């Protein structure tokens, strides 16, 4: 703590043999202000250090809280699926979906017991035992918190006490205080002798002016006062020693009682711990046996499911092979029948084309023969008509030769011949046209006959094709029936395959669930063992901390007892010193020492110590504006009466300018 103090300024004080001056009073006030500033500076440094420690602890606690929250969220995710109650499911879903860490920590802190119960329910462990353990741990934590609070309070009291002691040491080390009280640390006895010698010299000087009787009376009074003071000192020392002896005996008896109580509690705690360990071992052993039995039964079920799965796989493979063989047979038979039908159809088509060509050839020959027959008949008719006309011409020529004289008739005959030729020419033309028409008609009839033959052939081929189509439709219906039957068989096989697949997937899911349950049980066992180890370690750590706290508590109690004893001793010494001062003051007043140097020094002491306004209370508040010191009662009264000016220098001040000091 001395590192935080500022270097003390060097004060220029008057000679201790001389009475106090105004400079000594100002130096005394300045040093009091300096001590107060040092005190507040030390407190500020302590607060800064505590703030740093608390910030580091807060960061660690936030990290640990975030880790605990993440682990709780992971546990909640693993527990949600196995939870049956809808409210618990909603609560766990809300816990999983919350992203803000502050709200998550609030939810977990408000519902810690509920979360523990849910995790323990789903884990399948014994809830009552775990809740009992949690309650024991919570009670232990509460007791530890109470112990920590009490130890912190005691530590605060101890720090305050030590700060007061340091302030006393600072006051003892200060030159101004030693100058005021005439008690310097280095040579107190010498100063007392000097004071006594100076006082005696002053008294002698003054008494030299007076009569010898007054000097003898003064010396006798002073010696009597010194004798009484020594007796009072011895009495105070005796009372202090008696009080210390009483305190020590009481403290000894109290410590013996506490020791016996602690031994009894330690023995009871040991027995309780041994019983708890036996109970925990007896509980863990059946739990381990139950888990082993569960694992063995689950492994057997897993093996049985694997065997069933293998049987289903072999059946599935056989069915798939039979299906492939059946499909191959059907396809081969269908292809063979289709190829034979195609070949038969092609041969029939070839025969039909061949028959049609032969038929066309025969029909053409018949039509040609018929056409040739008609032309020969027409030629014969024409020849007959020509022969008839030639015969008629010959008859006419014979007639003309017989009748030569008939020229006129000849001309008429020639004209008739011309007309006949023209008529014959026209008839020939008509006959040629008629022949052409007949040829066209014959051709058309031939074509008609061909077309009719083709039609009849087509009809015959149509009938054959219809018969073939009927046969093919019958074959197609049979093949369709076969295909439908095959499709039905395929559907049944597919349903069987789907059922086999479903059974296979169910068996695989069951196997996965069994494996996951095995993993979860193993993980839970590992977690429980780790938690058990952690709890054991935490209990050991808490026990060690409690031991350390008990040790520190006993040390602090012993220190507090020592300081109480010292305080009582100091109180007794202060009371004796006050009695001494009162007696000395009375002796001085009775000996007429008001005009002396000692009386003046005491008056200066009173002006330094007591308030100049009321002269009743000690000076304990300084004004920051001017540095003058008064009692807090007078300052508050002046502020209440709106007299907000210093009574010595008339400088204004407010309630914020008041500074508490210790002279």
UniProtKB/Swiss-Prot annotation:
The keyword Zinc applies. GO terms for biological process: chromatin organization; protein ubiquitination. Belongs to the BRE1 family. Residues 133-172, 225-424, 463-588 form a coiled coil. Residues 176-225, 273-293 are annotated as: Disordered. Transmembrane segments: none annotated. It holds the Pfam family BRE1. It is found in: Nucleus. One of its GO terms (molecular function) is zinc ion binding. GO terms for cellular component: HULC complex; nucleus. E3 ubiquitin-protein ligase that mediates monoubiquitination of histone H2B to form H2BK123ub1. H2BK123ub1 gives a specific tag for epigenetic transcriptional activation and is also a prerequisite for H3K4me and H3K79me formation. Residues 273-285 have a biased composition (Low complexity). Pathway: Protein modification; protein ubiquitination. The keyword Hydrolase does not apply. Gene3D superfamilies: Zinc/RING finger domain, C3HC4 (zinc finger). This is E3 ubiquitin-protein ligase BRE1. A zinc finger (RING-type) spans 611-650. It catalyses: S-ubiquitinyl-[E2 ubiquitin-conjugating enzyme]-L-cysteine + [acceptor protein]-L-lysine = [E2 ubiquitin-conjugating enzyme]-L-cysteine + N(6)-ubiquitinyl-[acceptor protein]-L-lysine.
């Amino acid at each position: 703590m001395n590192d935080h103090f500022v270097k003390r300024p060097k004060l220029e004080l008057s000679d201790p043999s001389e009475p106090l001056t105004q400079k000594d009073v100002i130096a005394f006030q300045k040093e009091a202000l300096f001590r107060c500033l040092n005190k507040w500076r030390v407190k500020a440094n302590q607060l800064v250090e505590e703030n740093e420690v608390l910030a580091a602890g807060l960061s660690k606690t936030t990290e640990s809280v975030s880790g605990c929250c993440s682990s709780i969220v992971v546990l909640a995710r693993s527990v949600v699926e196995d939870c049956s109650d809808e409210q618990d499911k909603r609560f766990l879903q809300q816990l999983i979906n919350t992203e803000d860490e502050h709200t998550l920590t609030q939810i977990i802190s408000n519902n810690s017991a509920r979360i523990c119960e849910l995790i323990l329910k789903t884990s399948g462990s014994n809830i009552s035992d775990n809740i009992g353990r949690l309650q024991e741990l919570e009670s232990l934590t509460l007791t530890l918190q109470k112990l920590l609070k009490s130890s912190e309070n005691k530590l605060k009291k101890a720090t305050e006490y030590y700060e007061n002691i340091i302030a006393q040491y600072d006051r003892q080390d200060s030159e101004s205080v030693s100058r005021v009280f005439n008690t310097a640390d280095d040579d107190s006895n010498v100063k007392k002798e000097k004071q006594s010698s100076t006082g005696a010299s002053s008294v002698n000087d003054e008494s030299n002016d007076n009569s010898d009787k007054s000097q003898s009376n003064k010396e006798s009074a002073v010696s009597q006062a010194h004798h009484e003071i020594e007796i009072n000192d011895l009495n105070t020392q005796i009372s202090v020693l008696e009080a210390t002896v009483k305190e020590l005996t009481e403290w000894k008896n109290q410590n013996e009682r506490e020791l016996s109580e602690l031994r009894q509690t330690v023995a009871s705690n040991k027995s309780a711990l041994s019983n708890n360990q036996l109970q925990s071992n007896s509980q863990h052993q059946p739990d381990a046996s139950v888990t082993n039995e569960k694992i063995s039964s689950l492994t057997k079920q897993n093996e049985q499911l694997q065997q069933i799965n293998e049987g289903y796989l072999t059946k599935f493979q056989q069915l798939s092979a039979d299906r492939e063989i059946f499909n191959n047979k059907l396809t081969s038979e269908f292809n063979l029948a289709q190829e034979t039908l195609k070949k038969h159809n092609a041969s029939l088509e070839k025969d039909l084309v061949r028959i049609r060509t032969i038929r066309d050839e025969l029909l053409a020959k018949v039509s040609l023969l018929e056409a040739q027959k008609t032309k020969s008949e027409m030629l014969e008719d024409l020849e007959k008509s020509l022969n008839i006309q030639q015969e008629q011409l010959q008859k006419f020529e014979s007639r003309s030769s017989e009748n030569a004289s008939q020229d006129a008739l000849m001309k008429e005959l020639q004209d008739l011949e011309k007309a006949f030729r023209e008529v014959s020419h026209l008839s020939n033309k008509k006959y040629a046209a008629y022949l052409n028409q007949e040829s066209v008609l014959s051709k058309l009839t031939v074509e008609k006959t061909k077309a009719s033959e083709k039609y009849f052939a087509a009809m015959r081929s149509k009938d054959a094709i219809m018969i073939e189509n009927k046969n093919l439709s019958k074959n197609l219906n049979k093949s369709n029936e076969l295909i439908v039957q095959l499709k039905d068989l395929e559907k049944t096989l597919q349903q069987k395959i789907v059922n086999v697949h479903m059974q296979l997937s169910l068996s695989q899911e069951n196997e996965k669930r069994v494996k996951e349950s095995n993993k979860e049980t193993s993980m839970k066992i590992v977690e429980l063992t780790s938690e058990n180890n952690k709890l054991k370690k935490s209990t050991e750590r808490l026990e060690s901390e409690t031991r350390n706290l008990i040790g520190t508590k006993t040390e602090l109690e012993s220190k507090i007892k020592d300081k109480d004893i010292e305080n009582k001793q100091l109180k007794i010494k202060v009371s004796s010193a006050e009695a001494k001062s009162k007696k000395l003051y009375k002796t001085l007043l009775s000996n007429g020492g008001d005009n002396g140097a000692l009386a003046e020094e005491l008056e200066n002491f009173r002006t330094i110590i007591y308030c100049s306004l009321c002269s009743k209370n000690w000076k304990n508040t300084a004004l920051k504006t001017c540095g003058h010191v008064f009692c807090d009662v007078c300052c508050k009264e002046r502020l209440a009466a709106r007299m907000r000016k210093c009574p010595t220098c008339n400088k204004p001040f407010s309630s914020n300018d008041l500074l508490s000091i210790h002279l």
